[in-house]
UniProtKB/Swiss-Prot annotation:
The keyword Metal-binding does not apply. GO terms for molecular function: small ribosomal subunit rRNA binding; structural constituent of ribosome. It comes from the Bacteria. The keyword RNA-binding applies. Binds together with bS18 to 16S ribosomal RNA. Pfam families: Ribosomal_S6. NCBIfam families: S6 (TIGR00166). This is Small ribosomal subunit protein bS6. Transmembrane segments: none annotated. GO terms for cellular component: cytoplasm; ribonucleoprotein complex; ribosome. Belongs to the bacterial ribosomal protein bS6 family. The gene is rpsF. One of its GO terms (biological process) is translation. It comes from Geobacillus kaustophilus (strain HTA426). SUPFAM superfamilies: Ribosomal protein S6.
Length: 95
């Protein structure tokens, strides 16, 4: 099992309930694929360094997980498809 840090940015025009449901959905994707979520940090709404898909702001989420690569690959695949996530990155943490 490896440690990963996932950072994703949610589009700013979502209401709180929809944003929370999105976070839960993606956390469940990780859990269903055998990942153990060790920490979830909500950085809140922040200004982007540059415009992404005509948005100047976004809600930042940081998720630390311990999992096999399969779970992170599925998260990555679904995040690419989702219109609600405007940017994401997955980083493998060093041991």
């Amino acid at each position: 099992m490896r440690k990963y840090e996932i950072m994703y940015i949610i589009r700013p025009n979502m209401d709180d309930e929809a944003r929370q449901a999105l976070v839960e959905r993606f956390n469940n994707v990780l859990k269903e694929n055998g990942a153990e979520i060790t920490n979830v940090t909500d950085w809140g709404k922040r200004r982007l360094a540059y415009e992404i898909q005509k948005y100047r702001d976004g809600y930042y989420m940081i998720v630390n997980v311990v999992s096999e690569p399969k779970a992170v690959q599925e998260f990555d695949r679904l995040a690419r498809i989702s219109e609600d996530i405007i940017r994401h990155i997955v980083v493998k943490e060093e041991e």
